[in-house]
């Protein structure tokens, strides 16, 4: 059919909306209905003009197109997903999960007024930071604490408040870059501090710092290289030695710990990483770390240290630009209180629970999934339970893999790349990985309470796909 004739067959927007209404479409917004119809018609018009569409679309096909577009517009942009990648602190999938206790507190905080900045004892204005400061100090041993909206903000704010217009000395091997092109030298430049690099990429000694100290120096900075490792002929200055030098020269010390952990995980097979408490005990004046990585909480940047130094940071005009809201504080308080008992924290905090779950528990979970799917999918795909390796994620423990189990799918009538693509487009997307000619779902990051949903989605998908 000629293009002009095809274009004349395109439905009218108002008539299409009226038809949708007459068939009982339960959506009150004319704006969304109109946008859905216009999008479908515009897409059809483009196809006709490009020569890709040469036949008139059937009436019932238009109706289906409108409904599909409307459904997609109604779906939330930020949606639930099932993480079968095995990456526990997956930055692209939202980093740390929060527990049901946290979700309950967040719902209460959202639905009712709260004492965010109201002192219940005096009836006067209070400070939002006091809601979690005492708890952070009790857990870390610090004299004072401040919470901002992420660790990059924490680093910037500390440098801006303490070091603007002065020199900060840092090892060349610690000038890290993390996700989103966040580079320590760039942050220092924006904060107004002048960077002084010392040492070599692989080795830095105490005398390197001492030789670089001048009248303009205000701080010795350590940046924990949590997202990469330099191995072989290496050397770095321990926090205790740096603190000793700084005190002798009347300088401040600061550690950007990055992921930041309150629990030593070496008993669970992890390499030794410094905890926040250890750095505070070593006398570091300021320690910054993330809330949504190894801590297992909401996105936040936590600053701890000596009272006099943290108070200077609190008074910075930039503090207000980085302040956290009531939801972050509500979630963080619940997470922090779990740490009063480390065994409780390992069970209640999803991130820690996933990181420390044993292989036997993971194998049982994999078998549960396999039992539900194998018999019904035997003609559609081959299922196997295979050993695999999970990752911590979040820029933590870059060299440490976690032994795990995965359910591996090898389909009979559909390409692996097509499986990955189509599972990603489900209403509840399922994200896995392609490995050794199989589609793998690592069960470490699949929660027990979503096994049923996962199996239902997979059954529906494979039985329809052919």
UniProtKB/Swiss-Prot annotation:
GO terms assigned for molecular function: L-seryl-tRNA(Sec) selenium transferase activity
Enzyme class, UniProt record, top EC level: transferase
Keywords: Cytoplasm, Protein biosynthesis, Pyridoxal phosphate, Selenium, Transferase
Gene3D superfamilies reported for this sequence: 3.90.1150.180, Type I PLP-dependent aspartate aminotransferase-like (Major domain) (3.40.640.10)
Keyword match S-adenosyl-L-methionine: no
BP GO annotations: conversion of seryl-tRNAsec to selenocys-tRNAsec; selenocysteine incorporation
EC number annotated for this UniProt entry: 2.9.1.1
Keyword set includes Transcription: no
GO CC annotations, alphabetized: cytoplasm
Catalytic activity: L-seryl-tRNA(Sec) + selenophosphate + H(+) = L-selenocysteinyl-tRNA(Sec) + phosphate
InterPro entries membership: PyrdxlP-dep_Trfase, PyrdxlP-dep_Trfase_major, SelA-like, SelA_trans
Cofactor: pyridoxal 5'-phosphate
Subcellular location: Cytoplasm
Modified residues (N6-(pyridoxal phosphate)lysine): 293
UniProt pathway: Aminoacyl-tRNA biosynthesis; selenocysteinyl-tRNA(Sec) biosynthesis; selenocysteinyl-tRNA(Sec) from L-seryl-tRNA(Sec) (bacterial route): step 1/1
Main location: cytoplasm
Family from the record: Belongs to the SelA family.
Alphabetized NCBIfam families for the sequence: selA
Annotated PANTHER family: L-SERYL-TRNA(SEC) SELENIUM TRANSFERASE
Annotated function: Converts seryl-tRNA(Sec) to selenocysteinyl-tRNA(Sec) required for selenoprotein biosynthesis.
Name used for this protein in its record: L-seryl-tRNA(Sec) selenium transferase
Native source organism of the sequence: Desulfotalea psychrophila (strain LSv54 / DSM 12343)
Phylogenetic placement of the source organism: Bacteria, Pseudomonadati, Thermodesulfobacteriota, Desulfobulbia, Desulfobulbales
Primary gene name: selA
């Amino acid at each position: 059919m000629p293009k002009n004739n095809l274009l004349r067959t395109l439905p009218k927007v108002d008539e299409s909306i009226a038809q949708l209404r007459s068939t009982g479409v339960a959506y009150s917004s004319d704006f969304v209905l109109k946008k859905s119809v216009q999008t479908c018609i515009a897409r059809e018009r483009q196809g006709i003009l490009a020569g890709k569409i040469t036949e008139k679309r059937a009436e019932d096909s238009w109706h289906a197109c409108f409904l599909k577009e409307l459904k997609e517009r109604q779906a939330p942009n930020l949606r639930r997903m099932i993480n079968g990648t095995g990456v526990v602190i997956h930055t692209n999938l939202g980093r740390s999960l929060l527990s049901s206790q946290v979700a309950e507190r967040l719902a209460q905080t959202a639905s009712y007024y709260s004492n965010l900045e109201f002192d219940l004892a005096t009836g006067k204005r209070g400070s939002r930071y006091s809601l979690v400061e005492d708890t952070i100090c009790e857990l870390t041993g610090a004299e004072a604490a401040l919470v901002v909206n992420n660790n990059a903000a924490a680093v910037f704010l500390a440098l801006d408040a303490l070091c603007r217009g002065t020199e900060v000395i840092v090892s060349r091997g610690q000038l890290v870059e993390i996700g989103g092109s966040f580079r320590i030298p760039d942050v220092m430049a924006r904060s107004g501090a002048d960077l002084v690099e010392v040492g070599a990429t692989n080795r830095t000694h105490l005398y390197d710092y001492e030789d670089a100290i001048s009248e303009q120096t205000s701080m010795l900075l350590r940046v924990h290289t949590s997202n990469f490792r330099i191995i072989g002929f290496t050397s770095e200055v321990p926090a205790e030695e740096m603190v000793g030098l700084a005190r002798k020269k009347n300088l401040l010390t600061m550690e950007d710990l990055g992921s930041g952990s309150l629990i030593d995980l070496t008993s669970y097979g992890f390499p030794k990483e410094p905890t926040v408490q250890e750095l505070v005990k070593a006398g570091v004046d300021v320690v910054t770390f993330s809330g949504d990585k190894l801590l297992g909480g909401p996105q936040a940047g936590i600053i701890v240290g000596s009272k006099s130094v943290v108070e200077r940071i609190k008074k910075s005009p930039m503090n207000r630009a980085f302040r956290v809201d009531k939801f972050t504080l509500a979630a963080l308080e619940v997470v922090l209180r779990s740490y009063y008992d480390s065994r409780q924290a390992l069970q209640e905090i999803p991130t820690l629970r996933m990181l420390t779950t044993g292989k036997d528990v993971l194998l049982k979970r994999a078998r549960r999934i396999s039992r539900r799917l194998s018999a019904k999918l035997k003609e559609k795909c081959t299922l196997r339970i295979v050993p695999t390796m999970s990752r911590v994620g979040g820029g933590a423990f870059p060299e440490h893999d976690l032994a795990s189990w995965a359910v591996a799918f090898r389909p009979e009538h559909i390409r692996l790349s097509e499986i990955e693509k189509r599972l990603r487009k489900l209403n509840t997307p399922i994200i896995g990985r392609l490995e050794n000619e199989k589609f793998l779902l690592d069960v470490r990051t699949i929660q027990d309470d979503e096994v049923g949903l996962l199996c239902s989605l997979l059954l529906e998908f494979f039985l329809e796909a052919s």
